[in-house]
């Protein structure tokens, strides 16, 4: 009799446990491209931005299947030859085109063609311009990541958390129903 009870409980709770496993927290993948004449200057910017993005905890810096693309055009300004006067960073925020809806509307035999022809399309989302002294380069880079996080990542993170919370409420109510039926 106990074995039957355990089997019934397993059958009842297994789908709920499986549902709970799909509740992954928010994470995103960001590609970073920096364009600058000076390799040392470019390297510093890549290092500062990458480090700051990774410190967010839910961001992976990668070129493979990014959710976001940050393109930074960096310039150094000089006074009379070699003396650095300032830095200018133009940041463009891009998002790869989400072709899922389009592919759902296309005839099956054309899906591969449509998928290939839309790969690599990026949607322009935002642009910022930061200007400062060379000694403030790190704080300028931190500001870029803070702006990117607050304007683009944070809303997605909050949306994902709301989805998780509502799924947990649904699982909780299903469990309560099952427990009440047992009583």
Language-model segments: which ranges?
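N-terminal amphipathic/basic membrane-interacting segments and domains
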Residues: 61, 66-67, 144
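Sec-dependent N-terminal signal peptides
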Residues: 3-20
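Structured segments of extracytoplasmic/periplasmic soluble domains
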Residues: 52-59, 147, 151
């Amino acid at each position: 009799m106990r074995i039957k009870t355990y089997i019934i409980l397993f059958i009842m709770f297994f789908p709920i446990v499986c549902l709970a496993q799909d509740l992954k927290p928010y994470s995103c993948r960001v590609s970073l491209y920096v364009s600058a004449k000076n390799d040392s200057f470019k390297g510093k910017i890549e290092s500062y931005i990458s480090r700051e993005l990774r410190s967010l905890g839910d961001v992976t810096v990668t070129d493979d299947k990014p959710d976001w693309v940050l393109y930074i055009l960096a310039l150094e300004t000089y006074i009379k030859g070699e003396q650095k006067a300032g830095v200018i960073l133009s940041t463009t925020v891009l998002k790869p085109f989400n072709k899922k809806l389009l592919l759902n509307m296309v005839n099956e035999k054309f899906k591969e063609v449509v998928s290939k022809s839309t790969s690599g399309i990026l949607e322009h989302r935002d642009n910022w311009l930061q200007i400062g002294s060379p000694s403030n380069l790190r704080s300028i880079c931190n500001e870029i990541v803070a702006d990117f996080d607050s304007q683009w990542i944070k809303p997605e993170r909050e949306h994902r958390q709301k989805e998780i919370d509502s799924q947990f409420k649904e699982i909780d109510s299903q469990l309560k129903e099952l427990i009440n039926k047992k009583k």
